[in-house]
Amino acid sequence: MKRFLVFISLHLFLFLLVIAYQAQADEEWTIDRFRDLSYARVSGEVTHGDSLNFFISTEDNCNQVYNNFTFYTYEKPGDIKQLLDKHIPIKMNGVELTAKVISVSPFLMGYRVSFSLGKFPIKEYIYFLNEFYEEFQKYEIEIIDGIDFKAAKYFDIRTNNWKLDKLIPSVLEANKLCKTIEHSDS
């Protein structure tokens, strides 16, 4: 019996150690290019597959950042595609806004829904967003109910948050990458 308890205790300790390590994991940004744009992307903390994206296009002379995010959902209502091009109510750190649904696509056992927050001048936007993040010590988006819209019908997990400690250097690096695309492809 004593061996069994030691065995269970050791496994429980290892399990908790792995969980603690995952909870302390650093934010990891992906900075890359695709065709005529570069991007900086960070994964969500609640649902790792949800991403917060900052796209920079050569079409805008690498001066604008297009900010969007994705939510994955297992919910499969028959009318999920009707969300396309709709403005869905969200809360960003408790502030009520809307985000435009730009795509709904089958993914794994559910759907990936992409939302647009808009296009903004790069430096002004990322410094504003960084101040917003530092003020609240978080960057959280919650999909909420609205007029004729029940969030739970479409999204099983309605909240995610992202670490933005490396926002400024990551987006500025993507901006530099965009400028190399412009020069090398022109």
Name each region found by the language model:
Residues 1-25:
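Classical Sec-dependent N-terminal signal peptides that target proteins to the secretory pathway
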Residues 23-186:
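A generic "folded-domain core" signal
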